[in-house]
Regions:
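C-terminal amphipathic alpha-helix
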Residues: 42-84, 88, 130-179
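Amphipathic, well-ordered alpha-helical segments in soluble domains
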Residues: 64-67, 94-104, 127, 131
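Short, solvent-exposed, charged loop/turn and helix-capping segments
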Residues: 98-122, 174-178
């Protein structure tokens, strides 16, 4: 009888240990899954922060560039009547508007959440600011030529696009947001 009880106790102990060890494995898997999810979460946050930053840039520009957009719309008309052409006053307002956008962009701070891309984003914002400043300077002339400003703007778009591509996102076009 003693052998039977010892065998039964050994079997119970074996089953107990087997059950506990499978529990530990599932806990380990849960911990690994949580660690993986936590590691993946910051990437998603960077993407969200990047989109928030981009939208913030667009809002800042749109808040200041109304007169510039009005001037560009008038200047872009095909076969306009003389009264529809932009006036010197329109040009002066557009110049002030472009300078205000440049000043606003120059004061833009890169969020801490985007510190991994800070240098690239700062370079892109500086290019955008330089493009608007070039427009402001050209608008002070009687016959403004925006080719240099457009080239600088294109460089800024490419710089911002590279940051987006580094995060495996489609590059945006700020020009579509602000015009």
């Amino acid at each position: 009888m003693k052998k039977f009880l010892v065998s039964l106790a050994a079997l119970a102990l074996f089953l107990g240990l087997a059950a506990c060890s499978s529990n530990d494995e599932s806990k380990t898997e849960e911990k690994d899954t949580k660690k993986t999810e936590e590691a993946a979460a910051p990437k998603n946050d960077v993407k969200k922060d990047l989109v928030k930053f981009y939208n913030g840039l667009a809002e800042k520009i749109n808040a200041k560039d109304g007169d510039l957009n009005a001037y560009e719309a008038k200047a872009a008309k095909k076969d306009p009547k003389p009264e529809d052409l932009p006036t010197a006053e329109d040009r002066a307002k557009a110049s002030e508007s472009a300078a205000a956008v440049a000043a606003e962009l120059n004061s833009t701070q890169i969020p801490v959440e985007l510190k991994d891309h800070q240098a690239d984003l700062e370079a892109a914002v500086k290019e955008y600011a330089a493009a608007y400043q070039a427009k402001a300077d050209e608008l002070k002339k009687d016959a403004p030529n925006f080719e240099a400003a457009e080239a600088t703007y294109t460089k800024a778009e490419e710089a911002l696009g590279k940051v987006y591509e580094a995060e495996k996102m489609f590059p945006p076009s700020l020009g579509n947001q602000v015009n």
